[in-house]
């Protein structure tokens, strides 16, 4: 996918780096699979901010993605690739032999006209979705389920993938990009290949306004606030905050572990931080 640098005709365009993909559909999305999406501004039902730095941005519509891929044994063909404002990966509109259309996460290297299948008898090729028990060990996969039938939860963003490294009994072992190795039930499904749009990390927005278009508001440093607003706030002149970095609520940050789900610790074979 070509990388486009804009001419510095203004300060806002000087640092912009865009990605150009001529294969993406230029029209409107497939309407039956589009739903309205309301803005929350980071507020809950009481009106209080529960997530900071959210607000504004261009109006978006949600594309309903098929993360379960349960239409087994029915041949399908990719009709077109599309941009999705709700995720970094591209999506593909798939048409099945029975006439139904669904959106899926577009695998890397696939284009309009390519066939895709799902089910235990699906061919071992990029875009096929199978249970982990039917995927060869060593394969690169994405859109991996954590619970059978729940739908894909792992490796869904642009360029993401995991590797199937072992299979023993009821569990398969996968290696995540972070280095973590974890066990997943062999009945969980995954799609062969990597996620599309792997060059997404090379994009540069170029100006603050481009973040605002995406609904992201500015992040103010704690040391620039008043004492009433942040534990690092206040002081005469510029200060370092006077303590180890904490969140606005006093919880240690920058390396502090926050994982609380001890129930699934037994599924993690090796931590991402293990040497």
UniProtKB/Swiss-Prot annotation:
<dbReference type="Pfam" id="PF03947">
    <property type="entry name" value="Ribosomal_L2_C"/>
</dbReference>
<dbReference type="InterPro" id="IPR022666">
    <property type="entry name" value="Ribosomal_uL2_RNA-bd_dom"/>
</dbReference>
<keyword id="KW-0699">rRNA-binding</keyword>
<feature type="region of interest" description="Disordered">
    <location>
        <begin position="28"/>
        <end position="53"/>
    </location>
</feature>
<protein>
    <recommendedName>
        <fullName>Large ribosomal subunit protein uL2</fullName>
    </recommendedName>
</protein>
<dbReference type="Pfam" id="PF00181">
    <property type="entry name" value="Ribosomal_L2"/>
</dbReference>
<keyword id="KW-0694">RNA-binding</keyword>
<dbReference type="GO" id="GO:0003735">
    <property type="term" value="F:structural constituent of ribosome"/>
</dbReference>
<comment type="function">
    <text>One of the primary rRNA binding proteins. Required for association of the 30S and 50S subunits to form the 70S ribosome, for tRNA binding and peptide bond formation. It has been suggested to have peptidyltransferase activity; this is somewhat controversial. Makes several contacts with the 16S rRNA in the 70S ribosome.</text>
</comment>
<dbReference type="InterPro" id="IPR012340">
    <property type="entry name" value="NA-bd_OB-fold"/>
</dbReference>
<feature type="compositionally biased region" description="Basic and acidic residues">
    <location>
        <begin position="28"/>
        <end position="38"/>
    </location>
</feature>
<feature type="compositionally biased region" description="Basic residues">
    <location>
        <begin position="254"/>
        <end position="275"/>
    </location>
</feature>
<dbReference type="GO" id="GO:0019843">
    <property type="term" value="F:rRNA binding"/>
</dbReference>
<dbReference type="InterPro" id="IPR008991">
    <property type="entry name" value="Translation_prot_SH3-like_sf"/>
</dbReference>
<dbReference type="GO" id="GO:0002181">
    <property type="term" value="P:cytoplasmic translation"/>
</dbReference>
<keyword id="KW-0689">Ribosomal protein</keyword>
<keyword id="KW-0687">Ribonucleoprotein</keyword>
<dbReference type="InterPro" id="IPR014726">
    <property type="entry name" value="Ribosomal_uL2_dom3"/>
</dbReference>
<dbReference type="InterPro" id="IPR022669">
    <property type="entry name" value="Ribosomal_uL2_C"/>
</dbReference>
<dbReference type="InterPro" id="IPR014722">
    <property type="entry name" value="Rib_uL2_dom2"/>
</dbReference>
<dbReference type="GO" id="GO:0016740">
    <property type="term" value="F:transferase activity"/>
</dbReference>
<dbReference type="InterPro" id="IPR022671">
    <property type="entry name" value="Ribosomal_uL2_CS"/>
</dbReference>
<dbReference type="GO" id="GO:0015934">
    <property type="term" value="C:large ribosomal subunit"/>
</dbReference>
<dbReference type="InterPro" id="IPR002171">
    <property type="entry name" value="Ribosomal_uL2"/>
</dbReference>
<comment type="subunit">
    <text>Part of the 50S ribosomal subunit. Forms a bridge to the 30S subunit in the 70S ribosome.</text>
</comment>
<feature type="region of interest" description="Disordered">
    <location>
        <begin position="222"/>
        <end position="275"/>
    </location>
</feature>
<dbReference type="InterPro" id="IPR005880">
    <property type="entry name" value="Ribosomal_uL2_bac/org-type"/>
</dbReference>
<comment type="similarity">
    <text>Belongs to the universal ribosomal protein uL2 family.</text>
</comment>
């Amino acid at each position: 996918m070509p990388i486009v640098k804009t001419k510095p005709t203004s300060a806002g365009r000087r640092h912009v780096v865009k990605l150009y993909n001529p294969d993406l559909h230029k029209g409107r999305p497939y309407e039956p699979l589009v739903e309205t999406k309301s803005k929350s501004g980071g507020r809950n039902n009481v009106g209080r901010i529960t997530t900071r730095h959210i607000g504004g941005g261009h109006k978006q519509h949600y594309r309903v993605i098929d993360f379960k891929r349960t239409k087994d044994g029915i041949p399908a063909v990719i009709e077109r690739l599309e941009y999705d404002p709700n995720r970094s990966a591209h999506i593909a509109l798939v048409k099945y032999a029975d006439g139904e259309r669904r959106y899926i996460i577009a695998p890397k290297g696939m284009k309009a006209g390519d066939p895709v299948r799902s089910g235990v008898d699906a061919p071992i090729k990029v875009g096929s979705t199978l249970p982990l028990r039917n995927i060869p060990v060593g394969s690169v996969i994405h859109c991996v389920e954590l619970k059978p039938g729940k739908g894909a939860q792992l490796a869904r963003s642009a360029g993401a993938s995991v590797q199937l490294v072992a299979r023993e009994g009821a569990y398969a072992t996968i290696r995540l990009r972070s280095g973590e190795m974890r066990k997943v039930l062999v009945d969980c499904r995954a799609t062969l290949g990597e996620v599309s749009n792997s060059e997404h990390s090379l994009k540069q927005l170029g100006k603050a306004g481009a973040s605002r278009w995406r609904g992201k508001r500015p992040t103010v440093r704690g040391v620039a606030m008043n004492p009433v607003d942040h534990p690092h706030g206040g002081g005469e002149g510029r200060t370092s905050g006077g303590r180890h970095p904490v969140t606005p609520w006093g919880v240690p940050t920058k390396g502090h572990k926050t994982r609380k789900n001890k129930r699934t610790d037994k599924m993690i074979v090796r931590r991402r931080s293990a040497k």
